[in-house]
Amino acid sequence: MEEKKTGTTTVGIKVKEGVVLAADTQASLGNMVETLNIRKILPITDRIAITTAGSVGDVQALARMLEAQARYYQFTWGRPMTTRAMANLLSNILNENKWFPYMVQIIIGGYVDKPELASVDALGGLVFEKYTATGSGSPFAIAIIEDGYREDMSIEEAKELAVRAVKTAGKRDVYTGERKVQVVVITKDGMKEEFVEFKE
């Protein structure tokens, strides 16, 4: 059976004001575009979200687990789980299943007590970063981010950089959509989602 290629580009940028997550909205299977309107950034709480690259079913199952754990933590301890704690939990879940892995590559970002951003691979490898990218278009996206990132940039500048990175990846990677970018901005004031569309 021939393996079908899927792809995407998701990025995360952390600045002093918060975290920006961005992703294309195209879902592909092999050489076919399944849809141009899929959400690849999933909220876990009102202050933490993950980006999805890899098996859709695996990501959805992990998101449900994280949501349940976050609710349980809040109920038990009376305070929200931090982004760092949730990233470590996700890393442990993935590592425990390394012999039958979830086929995912995830960026987790949030602002609970401070902005935090991390990437987690399918075996649970966890790295906290200032910026990162995942998916088939990530080499193109990360080049744009590395060229434009500054630690003192505003959240609005970070958003513009993230959108540009995903759009550039879409121009070079056939498995990444370039018509629309989903953007989630998380600050001390909460989470906001928007879609940036481009004319063909």
UniProtKB/Swiss-Prot annotation:
SUPFAM superfamilies: N-terminal nucleophile aminohydrolases (Ntn hydrolases). It catalyses: Cleavage of peptide bonds with very broad specificity. The active site is at T8. The formation of the proteasomal ATPase PAN-20S proteasome complex, via the docking of the C-termini of PAN into the intersubunit pockets in the alpha-rings, triggers opening of the gate for substrate entry. Interconversion between the open-gate and close-gate conformations leads to a dynamic regulation of the 20S proteasome proteolysis activity. Gene3D superfamilies: Glutamine Phosphoribosylpyrophosphate, subunit 1, domain 1. Its EC number is 3.4.25.1. InterPro entries: Ntn_hydrolases_N, Pept_T1A_Psome_bsu_arc, Pept_T1A_subB, Proteasome_bsu_CS, Proteasome_sua/b, Proteasome_suB-type. GO terms for molecular function: threonine-type endopeptidase activity. GO terms for cellular component: cytoplasm; proteasome core complex, beta-subunit complex. Residues 1-7 form a propeptide. GO terms for biological process: proteasomal protein catabolic process. It is found in: Cytoplasm. Keywords: Autocatalytic cleavage, Cytoplasm, Hydrolase, Protease, Proteasome, Threonine protease, Zymogen. The keyword Cytoplasm applies. PROSITE patterns: PROTEASOME_BETA_1, PROTEASOME_BETA_2. It is an enzyme of class 3 (hydrolase). The 20S proteasome core is composed of 14 alpha and 14 beta subunits that assemble into four stacked heptameric rings, resulting in a barrel-shaped structure. The two inner rings, each composed of seven catalytic beta subunits, are sandwiched by two outer rings, each composed of seven alpha subunits. The catalytic chamber with the active sites is on the inside of the barrel. Has a gated structure, the ends of the cylinder being occluded by the N-termini of the alpha-subunits. Is capped at one or both ends by the proteasome regulatory ATPase, PAN. Belongs to the peptidase T1B family. Component of the proteasome core, a large protease complex with broad specificity involved in protein degradation. This is Proteasome subunit beta 2. It comes from Thermococcus gammatolerans (strain DSM 15229 / JCM 11827 / EJ3). The lineage of its organism: Archaea, Methanobacteriati, Methanobacteriota, Thermococci, Thermococcales.
